[in-house]
From Swiss-Prot:
This is UDP-N-acetylmuramoylalanine--D-glutamate ligase. The keyword Disulfide bond does not apply. GO terms for cellular component: cytoplasm. It catalyses: UDP-N-acetyl-alpha-D-muramoyl-L-alanine + D-glutamate + ATP = UDP-N-acetyl-alpha-D-muramoyl-L-alanyl-D-glutamate + ADP + phosphate + H(+). One of its GO terms (molecular function) is ATP binding. ATP binds at G111, T112, N113, G114, K115, S116, T117. It comes from Rickettsia bellii (strain RML369-C). The keyword ATP-binding applies. It comes from the Bacteria.
Length: 450
């Protein structure tokens, strides 16, 4: 879906993606643009000009050659209906990026959980071994703003982005896991699975699909692709040793795909837990395809420092480990970090998600004491009552201070203070990043005082 200079293009959505699309196309074609939110339109006007902002009620939207849609726009939106009624092709920033990146290795990662960590880990392993593969996509850097690379890119792709792709084809595609998510967008689980599986569309016989077969939904996709014989498939598992695939069991990585070898993983506090074993297995497979030796890959994995706010290990003070998992905004995500640790002083709170912390109850035995704050504190207290020790706090700062005070009295050899909120942050913070930054500042202040 090539963009030509004389074409009339509509850009809908002024988030990071929409802005990157406009910047990419403004000198190449005639553009009109719009966003439903006034605050976004004002931002666009400050950056560029209000002359390009045309409401979708204007007839100009009916006479376009293409519409570039931002991934956050639901496919039930009026702009999509206009495109269908007037036979206007809808495209995306991912497809535009694909057009300009021919000849480069495009590595794509998707999954309900672990996408960002895996994307960053792959890039780290390759960079650590002299290969330039910048990250881009859903990880925070729009693909059209990715820094130049002579080798390739590691792209994190969400189901929203995959929903829109029509020409993009990865050289290596990773599917980490699928659990119910974004069902408001995809209508049902089948729609969500279909979107995720699009990461394997249009791949050729020399391309690789790397899939977690421990996950039932992913295993079904693996089986379907296996029957088509159109790409090379590498299964991975963290529950069993595969006869042909990549496995991680008890911190031993077994490579029975490229050659029959096993290695002990070097301990890395930024990559603890079964969920991170999935991320490591997938990243290892990618690096092997690229041509790296196993020993080099294992060494690079050990030096990965993790991503901010995703089970981020901050350090140890007074035999207490501090972990920032502010990104864990629901119980399913928080379970992963709780499962990875013991003797936990757990900080949780904010605006509760559906189900609260019910999913965590089977793992309450790992929690020494909980510190609940924010709007959810009473709800969480009711769930925890008579099962674990807890205290209700005014805010995250008080929760941190009380947790540290209690952990200092604990004579256990290793204690862990974990921020895994199980909530959205909007009652006290702008976003999960701001929440995590406060936790980091509290840790740093404590460290300076010692």
């Amino acid at each position: 879906m090539t963009i030509h200079k004389k074409q009339n293009i509509g850009v809908f959505g002024f988030g990071k993606t929409g802005i990157s699309v406009y910047e990419e196309l403004q000198s190449k074609c005639n553009i009109i643009a719009y966003d439903d939110l006034e605050v976004n339109r004002n931002k666009f006007e400050e950056l560029f000009s209000k002359n390009y902002i045309i409401p979708i009620s204007d007839i100009k939207w009916q006479n376009l050659d293409k519409i570039v849609l931002s991934p956050g726009i639901p496919l039930t939106h009026e702009i999509v209906k206009i495109a269908k009624n007037f036979n206007i092709p809808i495209t995306s920033d991912i497809d535009l990026f694909f057009e300009k990146s021919k000849g480069l290795n495009l590595l794509a990662v998707t999954g309900t959980n672990g996408k960002s960590t895996t994307t960053a880990l792959i890039s780290h392993i390759l960079s650590d071994n002299g290969l330039d593969y910048p990250v881009a996509g859903n990880i925070g850097v729009p693909v059209l703003q990715a820094k130049a690379s002579k080798g390739g890119y590691v792209l994190e792709l969400s189901s929203f982005q995959l929903d829109l792709v029509k020409t993009f084809a990865a050289k290596i595609a990773v599917l980490l896991n699928i659990t119910p998510d974004h069902l408001d967008r995809h209508e049902n689980m089948e729609g969500y699975i279909t979107a995720k599986s699009k990461i394997f569309d249009r791949m050729d016989k020399d391309s690789y699909g790397i899939i977690n077969i421990d996950n039932d939904y992913c295993h079904e996709i693996f089986t379907n692709l296996q029957q088509k014989h159109h790409i090379k498939l590498i299964p991975f598992s963290v529950t069993k040793i595969l006869e042909k695939g990549i496995s991680i069991v008890n911190d031993i990585i077994t490579d029975n795909f490229f050659e029959h070898i096993s290695f002990k993983l070097i301990s890395n506090k930024s990559l603890q837990g079964i969920h991170n074993s999935e991320n490591i297995a997938a990243s290892y497979a990618v690096a092997r395809i690229i041509g790296l030796e196993p020993v080099k890959i294992i060494e690079s994995i050990s030096s990965f420092q993790g991503l901010p706010h995703r089970m981020q290990y901050l350090g140890n003070i007074d035999d207490i480990n501090f972990y920032n998992d502010s990104k864990a905004s629901n119980a399913i995500a928080a379970v992963q970090s709780i499962k990875a640790l013991d003797n936990i002083y757990w900080l949780a709170g904010g605006i509760a998600k559906e189900g609260g912390i019910e999913e965590i109850k089977p793992y309450f035995s790992k929690i020494k004491k909980a510190y609940f704050y924010g709007q959810a504190k009473e709800m969480f207290a009711n769930t925890a009552k008579d099962i674990i020790d807890f205290v209700i706090c005014d805010d995250l700062k008080q929760a941190f201070e009380l947790a540290y005070k209690d952990a200092c009295k604990d004579n256990e050899k290793e204690k862990n203070i974990l921020l895994a909120p199980c909530c959205s942050s909007y009652d006290q913070f702008k976003n999960f990043e701001e929440r995590g930054e406060l936790f980091i500042r509290l840790y740093n202040t404590l460290n300076l005082c010692l």
